[in-house]
């Protein structure tokens, strides 16, 4: 078959493009929670410093099942081979799902030309020049069945490739993979039930009174006890082998990295990847005592001071405690270490505990006008069991064979993290101005946050994957805690007068840590660089029930930049740039 010649001298022509790959992914989770609570409240006499006492108990059971398939990428056709003489399945080829039988329906009708007009607002040349490109034209989300049927027909047209277990090696829809649960697109290891049972009890005293110097004191003191039991169901799933056979290795013109291994290692790898599924149910429990004290002192009618002491917990996201292992050896050059294939994969951690924190915060608040205030707050937090990432080399044994893998998972750090800082906030409506300017106001704040991260458990500097640059071993204790910027500033100009409401707000933050581990080689920490965004809104109240307006987001068209941290000197290099565009929304709000 010719290519890009004769009457087919442009990339817009389906003759010059082929169907290369497809991917589907399905999430279908469900859950329910049953809860029972009982509270009692007792109020003291009006002349007592004790205002009220409250106590209660609560029981809850959350039953949740996460169904989360792999990202099912697979080849449809390729330039380097196929079942027929034409190599890949070109976009103008007839397709009937058979590489050896002529005829079928043209796939041109499945394409749609996309010209990439106004690419990056015209500031960057379009990657396609002046030519459009053909792409799959149907709506995949709305017509998944059609997408699946078409992709399967193309893949079978190129060649129905199967391994020694009769499992497809080219792309097939999720539900047609080997080992799925009947009637579903999910394999057993992709279905992760979890039951969490929590028992809690608390007691709290509220108090209020006046000191001899005229200060008015109020607040509360309390204690909560919480115990959680978590039971998870999961599997250690060993992949079915997709390695070349001995015949493939002996007849290959250019042997693959796997075929260059010794025959004994090749045989061991094939035996290891036999599709075994091993049940791996896990349970964990944790309990906490959580005291708290909050005190407010009103020094004058316009000046007050607050102090808070507490211990708090933040449970891990349910996606992090999924119980699954997908163990698969690789066969490419980078997967061969010391003459043996290895693999790299991520897992959940059903034993994760909540992040716990000891918190101190205080503030001074000055209400200098009925619609004006100036506040200064300070805070300190000491965090324990901070979530971080662990990367380790671990051996797995299956079918009498043992191989090494590099696995990553979320863990609770043994190190403590600290957060300290302050915030200054000012807000005021200038109602002393002449009309109509008396509706103008300002809301502004600045916060400073100093945080130290915790080290990420990673491979040693002598590990082969680190030496080869496939895994970073940066000390993440040198970085701030995830998601925290050192400097944060917000400024909003407000107008509220009669039926008109307007707001123009600028929010800015300095750089912050997005993740301690990127999803691709070399798995380095990723920073989000300093960024600011201007938003605005204007609303008009038609009557008590109807309001109309317009909202604008990212009016300055801010570009978000991320960087990767390269070494312990915190040298950074560009990772990605995102242009989110300006967004305008016209709003009609009505109540009936």
Task: Give the positions of each predicted feature.
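Transmembrane beta-strands of outer-membrane beta-barrel pores
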Residues: 28, 32, 44, 57-65, ...
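Outer-membrane beta-barrel signature, preferentially recognizing the C-terminal barrel domain
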Residues: 194, 284, 313-375, 380-383, ...
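Gram-negative outer-membrane beta-barrel transporters
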Residues: 379-383, 387-516, 556
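Extracellular loop and loop/strand-boundary signature of outer-membrane beta-barrel proteins
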Residues: 22-27, 186-192, 275-281, 346-350, ...
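C-terminal beta-signal and adjacent terminal beta-strands/loops
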Residues: 507-519, 539-592
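Flexible glycine-rich, low-complexity coil/linker segments exposed to the extracellular/periplasmic environment
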Residues: 1-19, 80-188, 246-278, 335-347, ...
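Short loop/turn motifs that connect adjacent beta-strands in outer-membrane beta-barrel proteins
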Residues: 43-53, 68, 97, 210-219, ...
